[in-house]
From Swiss-Prot:
Biological process per Gene Ontology, one example term: protein quality control for misfolded or incompletely synthesized proteins
Molecular functions (GO terms): ATP-dependent peptidase activity; ATPase binding; serine-type endopeptidase activity
Localization (cell): Cytoplasm
Similarity comment text for this entry: Belongs to the peptidase S14 family.
Name used for this protein in its record: ATP-dependent Clp protease proteolytic subunit 2
InterPro entries in alphabetical order: ClpP, ClpP/crotonase-like_dom_sf, ClpP/TepA, ClpP_His_AS, ClpP_Ser_AS
Gene3D superfamilies in alphabetical order: 2-enoyl-CoA Hydratase, Chain A, domain 1
A GO CC annotation given for this chain: cytoplasm
Length: 203
């Protein structure tokens, strides 16, 4: 089980303890630091919707260190990011692979960042196919549909052609931070919070 640190704040009426993720949420910071699953997606979506209800115009920060995960879970987060009325700043710390890379690229243009030693990776969707021949045909068709869908999203977010995305995604396609800028996944490599455009992070 992952240990979640707690922090203690002086509220003026005494001390209050809260887990570190709740404390970060007060500063409009959301962390995706594990495999992207349905439970994680529901938590992240709830956080994003809460922040939108608190202030529909102020930027939200999403920090990503994820090996990827389930496509439907990732797309649910992606659609929510696009649903929000505010800018969303995305940051890659460590790695943003597969669906993690797609979510990184989904941030507001000009506000997608990576730390210097981050690694990003895109690839085609995969999944184990079992069942009858009819089931296998249906599942294979669904994988091809998702492949085209994800390629279209990445093409829109990066500025690359759909054909290039499909070609590059045939195998695990790794990028360093500077390469990710050239590819269009991110906009800037930063070493310090002061280099971002968001004052709440830079202060």
């Amino acid at each position: 089980m992952t240990l979640v640190p707690y922090v203690v704040e002086d509220t003026g009426r005494g001390e209050r303890a809260m887990d570190i993720y709740s404390r970060l949420l007060k500063d409009r910071i959301v962390m995706i630091g594990q495999e992207i699953t349905e439970p994680l997606a529901n938590t992240v979506i709830a956080q994003l919707l809460f922040l939108m209800s608190e202030d529909p115009t102020k930027d939200i920060q999403i920090f990503i260190n994820s090996p990827g995960g389930y496509i439907t879970a990732g797309l649910a987060i992606y659609d929510t990011i696009r649903f929000l009325g505010c800018d969303v700043n995305t940051y890659c710390i460590g790695q943003a692979a597969s669906m993690g890379a797609l979510l990184l690229s989904a941030g507001t243009k000009g506000k997608r960042y990576a730390l210097p030693h981050s690694r990003m990776m895109i690839h085609q969707p995969s999944g184990g196919i079992i069942g009858t021949s009819a089931d296998i045909q249906l599942q294979a068709a669904e994988i091809l549909t998702l492949k085209k869908h994800l390629s279209n999203i990445l093409a829109e977010c990066t500025g690359q052609s759909v054909e290039k995305i499909i070609e590059d995604s045939e195998r695990d396609f790794f990028m360093g931070a500077e390469e990710a800028i050239a590819y269009g996944l991110i906009d800037k490599v930063i070493s310090s919070a002061k280099e971002t455009k968001d004052k709440s992070i830079a202060s």
